[in-house]
A protein has these predicted regions:
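Intrinsically disordered, low-complexity segments enriched in small residues
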Residues: 1-90, 160-190
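Anaerobic metallocofactor- and corrinoid-dependent redox/one-carbon enzyme cores
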Residues: 4-6, 108-190
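Short acidic, glycine/serine/threonine-rich loops at helix termini
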Residues: 1, 24-28, 68-69, 101-105, ...
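Surface-exposed, flexible loop/turn segments at secondary-structure boundaries
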Residues: 21, 97, 144
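Extended C-terminal subregions enriched in glycine
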Residues: 62-63, 79-130
């Protein structure tokens, strides 16, 4: 749902009964029902197939909550003595959030684990070295759309943050041929 609200901080969507300070509306222009099972279906459709080269969190930038959730997932692996190899986890956040996350130790924890924390940019406009990165895993349905269809045109899969972090630490979780883009849809060639 956050992709629907991406317009320079100006809400484009109010969830009836959920959005704080939503305006009074006498009639709605449309109705969208998106339940937990719909999200589970999308995750299943967009699950990684083939080797994942890079995990990215945040689109356009991770919120403080997303970055902290990522750090919590990372911490559980670090407690087992594991590190992220080859900086396979990139966390994108705003400069403002970076300062907050730096102050509370989140940035240090992520970097100590082997993650790269980038500020004031997003996965879509970042140039990727195609000799290293040809299949991305992200927590963001919006990033998946733009990474596949935008400037980079990279095969991209989607999973919840915990699963993304698991893939960053363990590349063998998704092995096999990397998907390639056929039009705007990623396919696996065998």
């Amino acid at each position: 749902m956050t992709a629907a609200a991406a317009n320079y901080g100006c809400p484009m969507l109010w969830a009836d009964g959920l959005t704080v300070e939503a305006p009074e509306v006498s009639q709605f222009e449309g109705e969208l029902i998106f339940a937990e099972n719909d999200l589970a279906e999308r995750y299943a459709e967009l699950a990684p197939t083939g080797t994942v080269d890079l995990v990215v969190i945040g689109c356009p930038q991770a919120s403080v909550g997303e970055a902290r959730a990522t750090a919590a997932a990372v911490r559980s692996h670090m407690e087992l003595g594991q590190k992220i190899q080859d900086s396979r986890l990139w966390v994108f956040t705003s400069g403002y959030n970076y300062e907050l996350l730096e102050a509370d130790g989140t940035v240090d924890l992520l970097e100590e684990a082997g993650a790269l924390v980038l500020k004031d940019t997003c996965p879509e406009v970042t140039p990727y070295n195609r000799t290293k990165y040809n299949h991305i895993l992200t927590n963001s349905l919006k990033a998946e759309h733009y990474l596949k269809s935008g400037l980079n045109r990279l095969p991209t899969s989607v999973a919840p943050i915990q699963e993304c972090v698991n893939h960053a630490f363990n590349p063998s979780l998704s092995e096999g041929p990397r998907p390639v883009l056929d039009g705007k849809k990623a396919i696996v060639r065998v």
